[in-house]
């Protein structure tokens, strides 16, 4: 298992080849099994396959990303991104067969009353990690995309006020012949301390 997951890489070039919805649904079922604060499961996974919605998301994301690359990002951040040859153009948001938009549910709404959710950020982060692992296990590629600010996702996907975008995952098979930057993960000695 370790060997397989050490080969996982983010992909920005997807094949338009259809992906069975069942693979996506099973990955989300797995993500939904993640632990959460007080078992409140404060997440929503919105699966987008409609071409028009994907177009709207791409256009809105590119507006924010262009602003980020041209005005918001500090030079050192742009320099850190250079090995990945990324910029504000996000064609993959339309090419990937699916977009999974992960929302964090900051509080519950029951009979018009707010119900506090605990450890929302941590819980949604864990569930998203489960989701990425399940997608990889299913033979699918993905990329964590956070076009900040992300409020346009709430509007386009018609989500309620208590749900906030956490991140966006384009999902599909990698394009044939796609290459990814040669990167290394830190060795165990750098990430683990045993006392």
Feature locations, PLM:
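A glycine-rich helix N-cap at a beta->alpha junction
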Residues: 66-73, 158-181
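Glycine-rich phosphate/pyrophosphate-binding beta-alpha loops
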Residues: 32-39
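C-terminal helix-cap and adjacent tail motif
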Residues: 3-11, 167-195
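Short acidic N-proximal helix/loop "leader" segments that mark the beginning
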Residues: 1-18, 22-29
């Amino acid at each position: 298992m370790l060997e397989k997951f050490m080969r996982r890489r983010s992909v920005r070039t997807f094949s338009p080849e259809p992906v069975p919805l069942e693979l996506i649904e099973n990955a989300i079922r797995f993500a939904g099994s993640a632990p959460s604060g007080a078992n409140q499961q404060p997440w929503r996974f919105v699966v987008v396959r409609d071409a028009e919605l994907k177009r709207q998301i791409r256009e809105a994301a590119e507006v924010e990303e262009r602003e980020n690359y041209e005005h918001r990002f500090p030079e050192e951040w742009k320099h850190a991104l250079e090995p990945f040859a990324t910029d504000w153009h996000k064609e993959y948001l339309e090419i990937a067969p699916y977009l999974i938009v992960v929302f964090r549910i900051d509080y519950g709404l029951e009979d018009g009353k707010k119900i506090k959710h605990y450890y929302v950020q941590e819980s949604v982060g864990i569930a998203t990690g489960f989701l990425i692992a399940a997608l990889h296990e299913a033979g699918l590629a993905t990329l964590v995309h956070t076009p900040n600010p992300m409020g346009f996702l709430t509007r386009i996907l018609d989500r309620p006020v208590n749900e906030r975008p956490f991140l966006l995952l384009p999902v599909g098979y990698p394009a044939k012949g796609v290459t990814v930057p040669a990167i290394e993960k830190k060795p165990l000695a750098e990430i683990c301390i045993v006392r």
